[in-house]
Amino acid sequence: KIFSKRHNWRRKKIMNKLVINIFLLILFSNNCFAKDELKFFIGKNKIDLEGYFIQGGYVKGKTSSKIKIKFENRDIYLGKKNKFILGFGRDYSEVANLKFNIDNKWVNKTLKIKKNKYKIQKIDGLPKKFVSPPKEIYERIIRENKLIAKVRSLNSKIDYTFQDFLLPANGIITGVFGSQRILNGKPRRPHYGIDIAAKKGSKVISPTDAIVRLSKKDLYFTGGTIMLDHGHGITSVYSHLSKVLVKKNDKIQKGDVIGLIGSTGRSTGPHLDWRINWFDQRLDPMMFIKNK
C-alpha cells in the first residue's frame, strides 16, 4: 500500500508538471496560428502551398510537374515530388512575389503576408561585456558571424526539411520568437529563436535528420553552438550548450542527441536557444512543431 501511494504520488506529480509545461508552452509561444492553404494553376501546372502566411512563418509548396520558380529573385530548388519551401522573416513586408517560368516567360503570383505581434522581454544581470562588447572583441564577433552566415547561405539538395520536426529539448519556454529584447535596461536586437530552460546537462536532440555544418565549443555570444542543415535553405541553431557532441559534416538522424544544455556565452542560466532560418530569413521555430 505504501509503495502504491508513493507510485501514485509520483505519477500525479509528473502529470501536474506536464500540464504546467504544456500551459506555459501555449502561454509563451507566439504560434497560435492555423495553417492556411493556397491552390492555383500556372498554365497547366497545379501549385499547392500550405503553411503560415505571416511574418516569421513559412509555406511548403508542391508543383504537379517540374517548373522554374523564383522567390524574391532567388532560384527555388524543387526536391523529391517537386516539393519546395519559402520563408518570411520577422519583419517581412505584407506582399511577397513568387514567379513561375512558363514558355520562357515569368508569371508573377502575389502572396499576402500577415503582420505578426511581438512581445517585449526584459533581461537583467548580464555581464556588461556581453551587452556592450569591448572593441578588442569586434573582430572575433565579425569572424564568427561570417561563419554563421556562410552556413545560412547553403541551398543543400536534401529533403530533411519536409520531415515533422521534434522539439529539441524538454523544459519550460522562457523566451519567444520575435520579442524585442531589453538587456540590462538597453534596447537590443529582437530575439530570433525560442529559449527552453532546463537543468544543465539536459539532452538536446536533432529535430529531423540533418547534416552538421558548424560545431563550436565557445562562440562569443552563443557559447557552445551547433548548426544543422535540413536542406532547401532551412538551417537550425542550438546555442549556449555545455557540451557539443557532434562534429562538422556528421550525418545525424532525427532524435539523435547532439549536445547538452548549458549557460555558455551570453546567458543568465541554463537553457537552449533554438533558432531556424530560411537562408537569411528568421523563422519562428514553434511553427515547425506539429503537435504544439
PLM-predicted stretches and their roles:
Residues 18-28, 98:
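Sec-dependent N-terminal signal peptides
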Residues 21-22, 32, 178:
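Cleavable N-terminal signal peptides
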Residues 34-117:
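Cationic-aromatic interfacial patches
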Residues 110-222:
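Surface-exposed, glycine-biased beta-strand/turn segments
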Residues 203-214, 246-261:
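Short, well-structured beta-strand-loop connectors
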Residues 207-245, 270-275:
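Zn2+-dependent peptidoglycan hydrolase active-site motif and core
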Residues 224-230, 234, 250-292:
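Conserved, short, structured surface segments that act as functional micro-motifs
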